[in-house]
Regions:
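Catalytic Zn2+-binding segment of zinc metalloproteases
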Residues: 114, 124-141
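Canonical positions in the second alpha-helix
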Residues: 278, 311-312, 345-346, 379-380, ...
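Structural marker of alpha-solenoid helical repeat scaffolds
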Residues: 281, 315, 349, 383, ...
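Extracytoplasmic and endomembrane cell-envelope/extracellular-matrix remodeling and assembly machinery
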Residues: 27-28, 40, 52-54, 60, ...
């Protein structure tokens, strides 16, 4: 009887939290349009003050993960964007209006893709449920932007954890109810998207143990996401009661590849030396051979990279994206036929992979086959519409085809996705000049200019 009553109690709590997630924020809260503007202004300032990871494999991995979870959410209120900041601290934060930021240190600390997805799902709930609007003590959007500025500090050392900084951080600390709502809805979205809901519990347990062992050096993530053993217990109970299933084993986790890319960005030669020593100890290991090949590619040693990646592919063809890596290396070794074959192999398995389409577009450009390059970059835009580089590449490809109208148009969209609205408007105006005044295409462009100006 107790189990039945407990199950009903947990289900009731979850139902209330779910209903609350789409309930109205306080009357004094900023509007949704104001939240979107705040998100855009915050991104502009973040680009000035923080270092972003601008690597297609890292960016598109995180973006793809976020899009996959958003499909499970369904009711999307905001134009969501996902970013990775080059920062060794373990942190992630959401900004009202749809922007989610992950520190590279967090990616390095998670053990699986599912754990990282659990963090993203949690942050999506905070945004979609308008928790920031509830935290704000007034309708003054400028004040909220000022409080969010605490996230722009590149390093939050002991001196920063005092006085005004800690006061501002506390203003962004989510309540117990908000955290439970983000936990319970988040694991539901996680499972619906095909990720392991238990990963959220695993990640929280590890954070909790670390906090107990080192209460002074707690992760920045916990400053705004208070963690208690009761919160973990409640999440475990929710997973059991909702009957959320763990997915079947999916092979080698792509997170290891992404973590290696991030590591190579910091100190490539030191990482390559470590990878070389690791392979010397296990010369028959396909993964050790593959990792060293990636290291050589990152440092421009293309022939060595090719030889190792080919060896790894022969030994273990199931390594995720090994054909994509080979295709990219073949471009640099001028073996274009092999590059095409490698890309075709991976696209048969993963036709919607934007990174492969990006590299294939680069291959077509090397061959001066610009129409085919355009088709590849259009695929990148299709599968990663909010990634600026896809639009930029498309604009340059159209320029090589002597189609300046389309070139300026897509370059404008790349600026817009980087929140450079002035440059976007200028490029759209240049694009409009290449179409007749009464043409439908020009009208679309002029409407876009008007919409950008109206958005501020």
């Amino acid at each position: 009887m107790w189990i039945t009553l407990h199950r009903l109690a947990v289900l009731s709590v979850i139902a209330c939290l779910a209903a609350a997630s789409f309930g109205p924020p306080p009357a004094h809260a900023v509007s949704q349009q104001e939240e979107i503007r705040i998100s855009r202004e915050f991104r502009k300032e973040a680009r000035r003050r923080l270092k972003f990871v601008e690597d297609p494999e890292v960016e598109l991995y995180v973006d793809g993960m976020g899009r996959r979870i958003l499909e499970a959410v369904g009711n999307i209120r905001y134009p969501y964007r996902f970013f990775v900041i080059q920062d060794d601290s373990m942190n992630a934060f959401a900004v009202p209006g749809g922007s989610i930021f992950l520190h590279s240190g967090l990616i390095q600390r998670v053990e699986t893709s599912d754990e990282l997805a659990s963090v993203i799902a949690h942050e999506i709930v905070h945004i979609n449920a308008r928790h920031f609007a509830s935290l704000s003590s007034s309708s003054d959007a400028t004040m909220l932007v000022g409080v969010l500025g605490v996230f722009l500090a590149p390093v939050l050392g002991p001196a920063a954890l005092a006085g005004p900084a800690v006061a501002m951080t506390r203003q962004l600390e989510f309540s117990r109810q908000m955290e439970e709502q983000a936990d319970n809805l988040g694991v539901g979205y996680l499972a619906r998207a095909g990720y392991d809901p238990q990963a959220a519990v695993d990640f929280m347990n590890r954070l909790y143990r670390e906090r107990i062992l080192n209460p002074v050096g707690r992760p920045r993530y916990l400053l705004t996401h208070p963690l208690t053993d009761k919160r973990i217990d409640n999440l475990e109970a929710s997973i059991r009661v909702l009957g959320l299933k763990r997915p079947r084993f999916r092979g080698v986790d792509e997170i290891q590849r992404v973590k290696l890319v991030i590591e190579l960005r910091k100190d490539p030669e030191a990482v390559v030396e470590r990878l070389r020593k690791a392979r010397d100890k296990r010369p028959q290991s396909a993964m050790a051979t593959y990792s060293l090949g990636i290291g050589y590619a990152a440092t421009g040693r293309w022939i060595r990279a090719r030889d190792l990646l080919e060896r790894a592919a022969r030994s273990e063809p199931a390594i995720p994206n090994v054909d994509r890596d080979l295709g990219r290396v073949y471009i640099h070794t001028q073996e274009f036929a092999k590059a095409h074959a490698a890309f075709e192999r991976i696209l048969k398995r993963k036709p919607d992979d934007p990174v492969t389409h990006l590299y294939r577009g680069q291959l077509f450009e090397k061959e001066s086959r610009f129409r085919q390059a355009v088709r590849s970059y259009l695929r990148v835009r299709q599968f990663a519409p909010s990634w600026p580089e896809g639009a930029r590449r498309l604009g340059h490809a159209y320029r090589k085809l002597n189609q300046p109208g389309k070139a300026h148009y897509y370059l404008a969209h790349s600026y817009l996705l980087r929140d450079e609205t002035g440059k976007a408007i200028d490029s759209l105006a240049r694009a409009a000049e290449h179409y007749e005044p009464d043409s439908p295409r020009r009208q679309v462009i002029e409407d876009e200019i008007a919409a950008i100006r109206a958005g501020g």
